[in-house]
Amino acid sequence: MKNVAVIGAGTMGNGIAHTFAQSGFRVQLIDVSENALKKGLETITKNLDRMVSKETITEAQKKETLSNITTFTNITEGVEYASLVVEAATENIDLKLKIFKQLDEACPEGIILATNTSSISITQIASVTSRPDHVIGMHFMNPVPIMKLVEIIRGYNTSDEVTKTIMDLSKTLGKIPVEVNDYPGFVANRILMPMLNESIETLYNGVAGVFEIDTVMKLGMAHPMGPLQLADFIGLDVCLSILNVMYEGFKNPKYAPCPLLVNMVCAGKLGIKSGEGFYDYSESRKAEKIAKQFQ
């Protein structure tokens, strides 16, 4: 397995492509948008430059990593030689089902189809394919080149052989794979998202401000960043999508998204990606200035 196709050139997609390419795999990075592919490659290059400056890789290794990546806007062309496809599109069930139908038609029998979904049922995604035994969850953490964990989620029909292959493959990437069961949110987001949502509720209810909430969690709980800063980093739209999946999946009110989160997403305040969330990122990507709405 030396050829890997990655669907989606956004934050997770380009991070996954970077990780595979740096580990010596030939990567076909696929996105319907030429602009997204351009931005994805720029992000990969910037991250590699940072690694060179920190002397964690050499200039030659940077060039080799970039040479391992080829871009495509056509799924059929992009997956032609792939032994594994990793889908990393937006966390939207309808979009993912559409992509997996396309992949099932375009990929030869025996090719493993993985999804980077952070909350959606692997069994449901696999149901639109003719190879549910070859569909698996491979949930990387952001930023992918740095974070060690990969949640490996087997659907109802995922085979033992495919699961072992992906577990072993994750280790060759320098990751630590953890196998979890196919329930909404899996492990990482089932625990993380209610905490972020409760932090937003705390702000919404006027218990404390942005600075105070994040400071309590950073200094009191030794978290590297506060929950509101983390929500901005993940993307408030992503947080909302995951909470909606969990709320629909469990029908438990504890997963219901805070009205403030819903309103912010509707207003286009998505965090770092949009330039504003709980913090203002118009001058810096660092959470140094609280957004005007919350001052």
Stretches found by the model and what they are:
Residues 36, 56-112, 120:
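Rossmann-like NAD(P)-binding element
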Residues 28, 70-72, 86, 136, ...:
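Hydrophobic/aromatic beta-strand patches that form the interior of the parallel beta-sheet core
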Residues 25, 143-152, 223-225, 244:
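Acidic/polar active-site rim loop that often engages polyanionic ligands
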Residues 2, 23, 164, 171-182, ...:
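NAD(P)-dependent Rossmann-like dehydrogenase/reductase catalytic/cofactor-binding core
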Residues 112-182, 186-190:
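Rossmann-fold dinucleotide-binding core
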Residues 1-50, 54, 106:
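NAD(P)+-binding Rossmann beta1-loop-alpha1 motif at the extreme N-terminus of oxidoreductases
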